[in-house]
From Swiss-Prot:
Protein name per Swiss-Prot or TrEMBL: Alkaline phosphatase-like protein PglZ
Function: BREX systems (bacteriophage exclusion) provide immunity against bacteriophage. Part of a type 2 BREX system. Previously called the phage growth limitation (Pgl) system, it confers protection against bacteriophage phiC31. The bacteria allows one cycle of phage infection, but subsequent cycles are impaired, protecting the original bacterial colony. The system undergoes high rates (10(-3) to 10(-4)) of phase reversion, i.e. loss and regain of phiC31 resistance.
InterPro entries referenced in this protein's UniProt entry, alphabetically: Alkaline_phosphatase_core_sf (IPR017850), BREX_PglZ (IPR047992)
Free-text description of this protein's post-translational modifications in UniProt: Identified by mass spectrometry as a slightly larger than expected protein, suggesting it may be modifed with a low molecular weight adduct.
Cross-referenced NCBIfam families: BREX_PglZ_2
Domain writeup: Deletion of the C-terminus (residues 835-974) still allows this protein confer phage resistance and act as an antitoxin to PglX.
Keywords: Antiviral defense, Toxin-antitoxin system
Gene, per the UniProt record: pglZ
Not necessary for Pgl+ phenotype or antitoxin activity: annotated segments: 835-974
Length: 974
C-alpha cells in the first residue's frame, strides 16, 4: 500500500483500492468492467496526482478489470481519451485517466465523451460508504484519518457486507477491518465451520488468533498508522480490553506467538503464587519479556498482566473442553484444540523455567506443574494420615483444569481410591465377623470395596516420588488389615464347613436358583430371567460393574428377607474352582462337573415348572455370519419370549490366566465381551437380569510361592498331605467340600498374596473372602414393575467411599436403639407442650446415637422418657414444627402424613439418597406414583427455595440433605 501524498493543491495520490472501489460503485460502468458491454469503450477522468505504481490493468471482483494511465498535461488527457475511445490503444474497455489538471483546461468536446462529462473527484469516504451499502457514516469514523484508505485497501472480494440499517458506525467498520486484516470471524480461513458469536473481537478471539502459525505477523506487516490504530481499537474496553492491550504489546515485541503461554505463566505469578522473594524476582524477569516498550509500568502493569493471565486461563480451559468433543464435525476441531493446548502448555513450562517461576507454576490450576504439585500434595496428606487434609488435597486435584483430560483420568481415580482407603482405615475396620454369613455380607458392602480401591492403586501407582511412597505405605496397611480379616474369615469358614450345619438364611451357590430365580417362576411371573455368570468375578469387580449398570438399570434386592434391602452375596462351594462351584450353581445342588453337565442339569431343574431354560457357554456366543451378534442357539433362546437364559462370560477368568491390568485397574461393561449386547437384548425383552459368578479371585501383585506339603490341585488348594500346615494354609472339610469327592478334606491358602503354582495375574481355589464370596446383583429396566418381594436398592457404596454424595451413613443396626414402650398401652397424642419439648430434645440430642423422646401416659401424667432412634426423633420434630405445618397448609392436596413420615425415615436411614421408585416401594405405593410423591415432598421440604430435597442429575434419584433440613426447619445443627 502507498502513502497518500499531495502532488498539487487539491490532488491526492490514489491507490488501487480507491480506484477499483470507485469503479465498482459506478453502476453505469459495470457492463464494460466485466466485458459484457458489447465492446463499448469508456473513459473515466479522476482527479489525482499523476502518479501510479499499481498494476496497469488491475483485476478484481467477479471478472472486473480496467486500464489505468496518468496524464500530467491537458494534451496527455486528450490523447489518452481519444486513442482509447477510437480503440487505437489496446487494453480493457474501461480506461481510468489520473490527472491533476483543472476542468477548464480541457476541451469541452473531450469532457463530453468521458464518464460523468467531467473530471470526477474521488472522496474516499464516499467510496467506503458505497462499499458498505450505507447511507450515512459515523462522524467518529471519519475522524480516523487512516481508516478510509485502509478500508478500501482491505476490501474483500465482492466488497464489504452491507451494513444493517444503513448506518456505518466506527465500531462496525473497524471491527470489519480488524477481522479482514487479521483473518478473524467471517474472514477466518483456517478455523473450520463458524459458530454464533465468532465475529466478536474480545480477548478470547485474540488469544485464539495468536496461537495460529504466522498470525501475529499479519499485524506487524501493516503500515504504521493502521497498525497503531487497530492496536488501539482492539485494546478498547468494548473490544479485547486490558487483556487485548497486553497481548498486542507482546505482538509489538515480536513475541505474539507466545502470548497464550506467557499469559498462563503470568496467571501463576500474579494470581496464584504466594508473595515471596522468588515470586517477585520471577515477575521482574517476566516483565522484561515485553521488550523496550511495555504496555504499562508499576501497578498498572500488574493490573494488565493479572487480567491477561485470567483471560488466558479461561481461553485454555475452553480449549481443553473443546478437545473432548470427538463426534461428528467437531472431531477435527477437537484434534486442533488438543494440538494447540499441548503446544501452549509445553511453551508455558519452558517460559516458567526461563523466568525461574517453577514454584509459582506449582500453584497454577492450569499448567502441568500445578497438576503435579497437587498430586504431590495428595501424597503428603496420605502419608500424614489426615483424612481431612486428604479430602482437601483430592478436591484441589479434581479442580485442576487438566484433571478432566482422558490421559489423567486413571491417575486421578487412583488418588480418589487412595482417599477412600485412607477413610476406610480411619474407621479402624474390625478384623472379625460373627459368622460366615456376616463376613460375606460385609465383603459385598465394605471389604470388597476396599479391594476395588486397592486394585486401582496397585494397577498404576504413580511416578511422583511422594505419591508413590504414600501409595506403597497405604497399600501395605490395607493389605495387612485385609490379611487379618481373611485369617479370621478362614477360621470361621473352616469351623462352619467342618460342623456341616445348614446355611440357614445365608444364600449359597447351590440354593441361589431356588431362592432367587425360583420364586419368579413359581409365582407365574411373566418376566423371564437372564442370568449372567461372569466366571471369576469378585465382589470388587461386581461392585464396579454394578455402579456402571445402575446408570441405566434399577437394582433390586431379590430376597424379601430382612428389614433393609441390600446387595446380596452367596457362599461358593469348596474348593473355589469352576468345576465345583459353577456346576453347583447350575445344578442347584453341591456337585462337580463339566460344561456338558451344566447344560444337562440346568434346564432339568424342577423350579422351572416345565418352562424352557438353557445355559450357554463361551463357544455358544460365536457367530456364524457377519451380521449376527450371538450364536444361533443363543439368539433363538433370547428372542423366543419363553426361555429363561443363563450365559457364562469368561473374560475375567481368562484375564487372570494371561496378564494383569496395568495403568487403569477399572473393570467396565465393555471389558467383558458380549455383556453390553446381552444387556441390550434383556432391556428390549423386559427380562430380569441377575449378574453373578461361580467364585471370586485374588489378584497377584505381591504374591509369593508357597511350597506345598503335597502336590497342588490348583494355584490355591491342595489335598491333605504329610507335614504341618503352613502359616497361610487352612484345612477345610465337610459337606461343602466337593473335590476330589463330596465330604473330602483339602488344604487351601487363605492369604491373598500366596500361591502354589507358577506366576499368573490372579488365582482362585483358595479360602480368602474374595474367592469364597459370590456377588449376586439383580436388575430391571427403569420403570419396570418389580416382581413381588423385590425391593429396589439405594446407593450401595459404603459411606467412606463417597460421603459427599451418599450423605450421612445410616446407623448400624446394632447401634440403633429401638423404641421402648413405657407402658403396655399406646401413648396418647402429645400436647402442644409435649411437642415443644420433643422438638427441643431433637435440637439438644442431634449428635447422639439415640435420642430421648417425651411421651405422655395420661392427660395429666408427667412426661415419660422413651428411647427412640435419632431418625425418629428428627422426623417427629419436623412434622410437628410450625414451618412444616405452614408448608403443609399451603398444599391443595395434602399427602398422607404416615407416608411422609415413612418416606423421610427411609431416606434418612438410607444415608439420604434413594431412587424415586425405591422410595415409593418402601412407602407402600405403586412405583408409577413415585415421581408425583417426590414432587409433593419437595414442595413440603424445599422451604424458601432451599433444596432440602434434591433430584440428582440422573432424574430418578432423590437426595435429602439432613443438615439443611435441620437448618430450614429450626431443628438444630446437623
Amino acid at each position: 500500500m502507498t502513502d497518500t501524498t499531495v502532488a498539487v493543491p487539491g490532488a491526492v495520490r490514489l491507490n488501487t483500492a480507491t480506484v477499483t472501489q470507485y469503479l465498482s460503485s459506478q453502476s453505469s460502468l459495470v457492463a464494460s468492467l466485466t466485458g459484457d458491454g458489447g465492446g463499448r469503450r469508456r473513459a473515466v477522468l479522476l482527479r489525482s496526482a499523476p502518479q501510479w505504481d499499481g498494476p496497469a490493468e488491475p483485476a478484481w471482483g467477479e471478472g472486473r478489470t480496467a486500464g489505468i494511465a496518468v496524464a500530467p498535461s491537458p494534451l496527455a488527457v486528450h490523447e489518452l481519451v481519444l486513442d482509447h475511445l477510437a480503440a487505437r490503444r489496446p487494453g480493457p474497455p474501461v480506461l481510468v485517466v489520473l490527472t491533476d489538471r483543472e476542468q477548464h483546461e480541457l476541451d469541452p468536446a473531450i469532457l463530453a465523451r468521458v464518464h460523468k462529462l467531467r473530471i470526477d473527484t474521488v472522496d474516499g469516504w464516499d467510496v467506503v460508504r458505497e462499499a458498505f451499502g450505507a447511507r450515512q457514516i459515523d462522524p467518529r469514523l471519519k475522524d480516523v484519518n487512516w481508516a478510509a484508505e485502509a478500508l478500501l485497501d482491505a476490501t474483500p472480494p465482492g466488497s464489504w457486507p452491507a451494513v444493517p440499517g444503513g448506518w456505518l458506525s466506527r465500531q462496525y467498520a473497524l471491527t470489519a477491518l480488524a477481522q479482514r486484516r487479521l483473518r478473524l470471524g467471517r474472514y477466518d480461513t483456517e478455523g473450520g465451520p463458524r459458530r454464533p458469536g465468532d465475529d466478536r473481537l474480545d480477548a478470547q478471539a485474540l488469544l485464539h488468533w495468536s496461537t495460529r502459525p504466522g498470525a501475529p505477523e499479519r499485524l506487524l506487516t501493516l503500515r504504521g498508522p493502521e497498525r497503531a490504530g487497530l492496536t488501539a481499537f482492539l485494546g478498547e474496553e468494548d473490544q479485547a480490553g486490558l487483556a487485548g492491550r497486553t497481548l498486542l504489546a507482546l505482538v509489538d515485541a515480536e513475541r505474539g506467538e507466545d502470548a497464550a503461554a506467557f499469559g498462563l505463566v503470568c496467571a501463576a505469578l500474579w494470581q496464584h503464587a504466594e508473595p515471596a522473594p522468588e515470586t517477585y524476582r520471577a515477575r521482574g524477569r517476566a516483565e522484561r519479556y515485553f521488550g523496550d516498550r511495555p504496555p504499562a509500568t508499576g501497578d498498572q502493569l500488574d493490573a494488565l498482566v493479572t487480567v491477561f493471565g485470567r483471560a488466558t486461563e479461561e481461553h485454555v480451559t475452553t480449549l481443553l473442553a473443546a478437545g473432548h468433543r470427538t463426534a461428528g464435525t467437531d472431531a477435527d476441531q477437537a484434534r486442533e484444540a488438543r494440538r494447540t493446548t499441548g503446544t501452549v502448555l509445553d511453551r508455558a513450562a519452558a517460559l516458567a523455567r526461563q523466568f525461574g517461576a517453577e514454584e509459582a507454576v506449582a500453584a497454577s490450576p492450569v499448567l502441568r506443574g500445578g497438576l503435579e504439585a497437587r498430586f504431590t500434595a495428595v501424597g503428603r496428606a496420605l502419608a500424614a494420615g489426615d483424612t481431612t487434609a486428604v479430602a482437601d488435597a483430592v478436591r484441589r486435584l479434581e479442580n485442576h483444569r487438566l484433571a478432566a483430560e482422558p490421559e489423567e483420568s486413571a491417575r486421578i481415580e487412583r488418588a480418589r481410591m487412595g482417599q477412600r482407603l485412607a477413610r476406610w482405615l480411619a474407621t479402624d475396620p474390625p478384623t472379625d465377623a460373627l459368622t460366615v454369613a456376616d463376613a460375606l455380607r460385609r465383603h459385598v458392602a465394605e471389604t470388597g470395596w476396599a479391594d476395588l480401591a486397592l486394585e486401582h492403586i496397585e494397577a498404576g501407582g504413580d511416578q511422583g516420588p511422594v505419591l508413590k511412597a504414600a501409595y506403597d505405605t497405604l497399600g501395605t496397611r490395607v493389605r495387612d488389615r485385609r490379611r487379618q480379616i481373611d485369617a479370621s474369615f478362614a477360621r470361621s469358614l473352616a469351623a462352619w464347613t467342618q460342623s456341616g450345619t445348614q446355611p440357614g438364611s445365608m444364600l449359597t451357590v447351590e440354593t441361589f436358583l431356588d431362592r432367587v430365580v425360583g420364586p419368579l417362576v413359581r409365582r407365574g411371573e411373566e418376566r423371564r430371567t437372564l442370568m449372567l455368570v461372569l466366571d471369576g468375578m469378585s465382589a470388587a469387580i461386581a461392585n464396579e460393574l454394578g455402579e456402571e449398570l445402575r446408570r441405566s438399570w434399577a437394582e433390586f434386592d431379590p430376597l424379601p428377607e430382612g428389614d433393609t434391602p441390600y446387595r446380596r452375596a452367596m457362599a461358593a462351594a469348596l474348593p473355589t474352582v469352576t468345576a465345583v462351584s459353577r456346576t453347583s450353581l447350575f445344578a442347584g445342588t453341591l456337585t462337580k462337573g463339566t460344561q456338558a453337565d451344566e447344560k444337562r442339569l440346568f434346564p432339568a431343574l424342577k423350579l422351572w415348572g416345565g418352562a424352557p431354560a438353557a445355559v450357554f457357554h463361551k463357544d455358544d456366543l460365536r457367530t456364524e455370519t457377519a451380521g449376527e451378534t450371538f450364536g444361533p442357539a443363543l439368539t433363538e433362546a433370547l428372542a423366543d419370549g419363553r426361555t429363561h437364559v443363563a450365559v457364562v462370560l469368561n473374560a475375567i477368568d481368562d484375564r487372570l490366566a494371561k496378564e494383569q491390568k496395568l495403568g487403569d485397574g477399572a473393570w467396565r461393561i465393555d471389558d467383558v465381551p458380549g455383556l453390553r449386547d446381552l444387556l441390550r437384548v434383556a432391556a428390549t425383552q423386559g427380562m430380569a437380569v441377575v449378574l453373578t459368578s461361580d467364585h471370586g479371585h485374588v489378584v497377584d501383585r505381591h504374591g509369593t510361592k508357597v511350597d506345598p506339603a503335597a502336590a497342588p490341585e490348583s494355584a490355591r488348594h491342595r489335598l491333605i498331605g504329610g507335614g504341618p500346615l503352613a502359616e497361610r494354609e487352612i484345612t477345610l472339610s465337610g459337606p461343602r467340600v466337593i473335590w476330589p469327592e463330596p465330604g473330602a478334606s483339602i488344604v487351601a491358602l487363605w492369604d491373598a498374596d500366596s500361591r502354589y503354582t507358577a506366576l499368573k495375574a490372579g488365582y482362585h481355589g483358595g479360602a480368602s473372602l474374595a474367592e469364597v464370596t459370590i456377588p449376586a446383583l439383580a436388575f430391571l429396566p427403569f420403570g419396570a414393575e418389580p416382581p413381588k418381594g423385590w425391593r429396589e436398592l439405594g446407593d450401595q457404596r459404603p459411606v467412606w467411599w463417597a460421603p459427599e454424595e451418599t450423605g450421612k451413613a445410616p446407623l448400624p443396626d446394632e447401634y440403633t436403639a429401638r423404641p421402648v414402650a413405657a407402658t403396655a398401652s399406646a401413648p396418647k397424642k402429645p400436647t402442644a407442650k409435649a411437642k415443644k419439648d420433643q422438638a427441643e430434645v431433637a435440637r439438644m440430642h442431634h449428635g447422639a446415637l439415640f435420642d430421648v423422646a417425651l411421651t405422655t401416659e395420661g392427660d395429666d401424667a408427667l412426661l415419660t422418657p422413651t428411647v427412640v432412634s435419632r431418625t425418629e426423633t428428627l422426623v417427629t420434630a419436623l412434622l410437628d414444627s410450625e414451618t412444616y405445618q405452614a408448608q403443609l397448609g399451603g398444599l391443595a392436596r395434602k399427602p398422607q402424613q404416615e407416608q411422609v413420615h415413612k418416606a423421610l425415615t427411609t431416606l434418612l436411614d438410607s444415608g439420604g439418597t434413594l431412587p424415586v421408585t425405591a422410595l415409593a416401594q418402601r412407602v407402600g405405593m405403586p412405583v408409577t406414583r413415585g415421581v408425583g410423591f417426590a414432587a409433593v415432598l419437595g414442595q413440603l421440604l424445599n422451604y424458601d427455595g432451599v433444596q432440602v430435597l434434591e433430584t440428582l442429575p440422573d432424574g430418578r434419584t432423590l437426595r435429602l440433605h439432613a443438615a439443611l433440613l435441620r437448618e430450614q426447619f429450626a431443628l438444630g445443627a446437623g
